[in-house]
Amino acid sequence: MTQPDRYAVFGHPIEHSQSPRIHALFAAQTGQDLIYTAEDVPPDRFESCVRAFFDGGGRGLNCTIPLKEMAWLLADSRSGRAKRARAVNTLLLRADGSIFGDNTDGIGLLRDLRDNLGLNLAGTKILILGAGGATRGILAPLLAERPDRLVIANRTVATAETLTVEFGDLGPVEGCGFAALAGRRFDLIINATAASLSGELPPLPADILAPGGSCYDLAYAAEPTPFVRWGQEKQAVVSADGIGMLVEQAAEAFLLWRGVRPQTRPVIETLEAERRTAK
């Protein structure tokens, strides 16, 4: 009897992950025979665990916080968008035994913002909180939407400024510390820090969200994250967490692995309904 193909997501922490549920729904929808699990893999064990997974018959991996830049280094070859981001969230074992790295975060975020939430980013002022691997993965697609300005705020200013040098050819991008945000307003604020995973909120001026502005947290949880609640308190038109992005980027990874694109809207609706029921 043929065994189902094996896939997994590696992260640290990982117990909150909805990825196994998402890929189970994708597999049922498309008739694909596979198993997808979530594995807690600390950074110091990442490479050995990846090698062991693929040596043991695994076909593909997702990598989440804090492993995306390590996955970029490990991959033998990379997609154009992964090369640009210098971060990888999807690994594929090729027939020749080499490991291919892709980054589906940016297109996943863009599809959720644009197609699911109905946001038009052209001419807007965008603020991204954090300058890690998650931010690297979303910068190029966001700048391709031609915002008026994109600002990256980070506790370590030099890290944010490094990204402005790397991505400055794609559009108007600048880096700064959180203190430099005083007196500025933005139409879309994206939280790409890990603060929500520990129940914290990045330090933001009270009036930083422009009237009619929106908030988006790349993280997600069973309950609204502190950043999503902050956006709701500021009367954001949209204040959403990253569950839609997670589904959209997962669909792109599923396409890479299986050659078929699942429908995302039914899966997003199922997850939202399950969250409401669980409350």
Curated annotation (Swiss-Prot):
Pathway: Metabolic intermediate biosynthesis; chorismate biosynthesis; chorismate from D-erythrose 4-phosphate and phosphoenolpyruvate: step 4/7. Keywords: Amino-acid biosynthesis, Aromatic amino acid biosynthesis, NADP, Oxidoreductase. InterPro entries: Aminoacid_DH-like_N_sf, NAD(P)-bd_dom_sf, SDH_C, Shikimate_DH, Shikimate_DH-bd_N, Shikimate_DH_fam, Shikm_DH/Glu-tRNA_Rdtase. It catalyses: shikimate + NADP(+) = 3-dehydroshikimate + NADPH + H(+). The active site is at 68 (proton acceptor). Shikimate binds at residues 17-19, 64, 89, 105, 220. Signal peptide: none annotated. SUPFAM superfamilies: Aminoacid dehydrogenase-like, N-terminal domain (SSF53223), NAD(P)-binding Rossmann-fold domains (SSF51735). Involved in the biosynthesis of the chorismate, which leads to the biosynthesis of aromatic amino acids. Catalyzes the reversible NADPH linked reduction of 3-dehydroshikimate (DHSA) to yield shikimate (SA). HAMAP family: Shikimate_DH_AroE (MF_00222). Homodimer. Belongs to the shikimate dehydrogenase family. This is Shikimate dehydrogenase (NADP(+)). It comes from Methylococcus capsulatus (strain ATCC 33009 / NCIMB 11132 / Bath). The gene is aroE.
